[in-house]
C-alpha cells in the first residue's frame, strides 16, 4: 500500500485510533525532536535502535532499509519478512508502566511485507531511566496497516499496563481488523490475545463489530480483563430491492484472568474464535 493510501486510511480510522485519546498519551512527535529529560537524544536515535540506517529525507519522511531481527508477537509461525526499504513521517509514541517502572513504547509501520499479505509493524520497548536502551521489539502486524487502538493502554495494576494495537485493511464494502492485547513481563512483550472483527457496509444494512475493554482490580498480581465485542446491524436507507435487514445488537464478551501456574493470562471462553469463524463465512 503506497504512502498516500496509508495516510487516507489513517484519517478514516481516527475515531478508533490512539490519536483521539489524548488522555491516554499517544503522540506523534517528529523524530528529530529531543526526548523529554534527554536533550542530547532524539526519537530518531531511538528509531535507529530498530532501523540502524534510518535517516531524514528531503520530503519530510524518514527512510531506511532492514530493521533488526525480531519475532512476531503471535509466534514463529506468524508474520512475513520486513520490506527491504521503508519510509514514514513519524512514529506513534506511548508511555507505559511495567513492573512499577516507566517505559516508552514506539510503533513503526514499515509498510508491506514482500512475502506476506500482512504488513510489517514494529512495537518497540525502551528504558529511558538512564542512557536510553532498547529492551524488546516485536512485529505486531496481522494485516496491512497497524496502529495503537483506543484505549491504547489498560491498567493491570498500580505499576503495570497492557498495550492495545490494531491491524486493518478495507475494500469497497468490508473492513477487517485484528486487535492485539499485549502485556509486558520482565521487559518483554507477551501476547494476551488477538481478536479478529469484521465490518460490512452493504446496500441493505451496515454491520459493525466494536470493541470495549474493562479491567477489574480484584485479581493479583494482575487485574482481570473483560473484552466485549458489540455486533450491531443497522438497516440501510436505500431501496435495494431486497428485504430490509432488521436492526439488531448483541454483545460477545470474554474475560481474561491471570493464571499463576502458567504465568500468563487465560481466556474464559472461545467466543472470539467462534465469532471469527462465523465472520469468515461472510468474506
Predicted regions and their residues:
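Acidic, small-residue rich beta-repeat scaffolds with periodic aromatic anchors
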Residues: 22-75, 171, 176-283
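Bacterial N-terminal signal peptides
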Residues: 8-18
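Bacterial N-terminal signal peptides that target proteins for export
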Residues: 1-9
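Repeat-based blade/solenoid architectures
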Residues: 70-90, 140-151, 200-207, 278-279
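Short beta-strand elements that form the blades of beta-propeller/WD-repeat-like
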Residues: 102-110, 160-168, 221-229
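A glycine-rich, hydrophobic loop/mini-helix early in the fold
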Residues: 102-156
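Eukaryote-skewed repeat-based solenoidal scaffolds used as protein-protein interaction platforms
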Residues: 138-187, 193-198
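Structural signature of eukaryotic scaffold interfaces centered on beta-propeller domains
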Residues: 89-100, 149-159, 212-219
Amino acid at each position: 500500500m503506497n504512502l498516500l493510501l496509508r495516510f487516507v486510511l489513517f484519517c478514516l480510522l481516527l475515531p478508533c485510533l490512539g490519536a483521539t485519546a489524548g488522555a491516554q498519551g499517544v503522540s506523534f512527535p517528529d523524530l528529530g525532536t529531543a526526548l523529554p529529560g534527554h536533550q542530547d537524544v532524539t526519537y530518531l536515535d531511538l528509531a535507529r535502535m530498530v532501523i540502524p540506517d534510518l535517516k531524514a529525507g528531503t520530503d519530510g519522511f524518514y527512510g531506511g532499509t532492514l530493521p533488526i531481527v525480531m519475532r512476531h508477537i503471535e509466534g514463529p509461525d506468524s508474520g512475513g519478512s520486513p520490506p527491504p526499504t521503508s519510509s514514514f513521517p513519524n512514529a506513534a509514541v506511548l508511555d507505559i508502566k511495567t513492573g512499577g517502572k516507566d517505559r516508552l513504547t514506539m510503533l513503526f509501520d514499515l509498510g508491506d511485507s514482500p512475502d506476506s499479505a500482512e504488513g510489517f509493524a514494529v512495537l518497540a520497548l525502551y528504558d529511558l531511566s538512564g542512557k536510553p536502551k532498547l529492551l524488546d521489539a516485536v512485529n505486531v502486524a496481522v494485516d496491512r496497516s497497524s496502529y495503537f487502538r483506543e484505549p491504547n493502554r489498560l491498567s493491570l495494576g498500580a505499576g503495570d499496563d497492557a498495550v492495545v494495537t490494531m491491524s486493518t485493511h478495507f475494500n469497497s464494502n468490508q473492513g477487517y481488523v485484528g486487535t492485539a492485547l499485549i502485556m509486558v513481563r520482565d521487559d518483554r512483550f507477551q501476547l494476551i490475545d488477538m481478536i479478529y472483527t469484521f465490518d460490512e457496509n452493504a446496500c441493505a444494512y451496515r454491520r459493525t463489530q466494536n470493541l470495549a475493554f474493562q479491567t477489574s482490580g480484584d485479581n493479583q498480581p494482575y487485574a482481570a480483563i473483560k473484552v466485549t465485542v458489540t455486533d450491531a446491524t443497522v438497516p440501510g436507507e436505500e431501496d435495494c430491492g431486497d428485504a430490509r435487514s432488521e436492526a439488531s445488537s448483541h454483545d460477545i464478551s470474554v474475560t481474561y484472568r491471570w493464571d499463576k501456574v502458567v504465568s500468563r493470562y487465560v481466556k474464559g471462553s472461545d467466543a472470539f474464535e467462534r465469532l471469527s469463524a462465523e465472520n469468515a463465512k461472510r468474506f
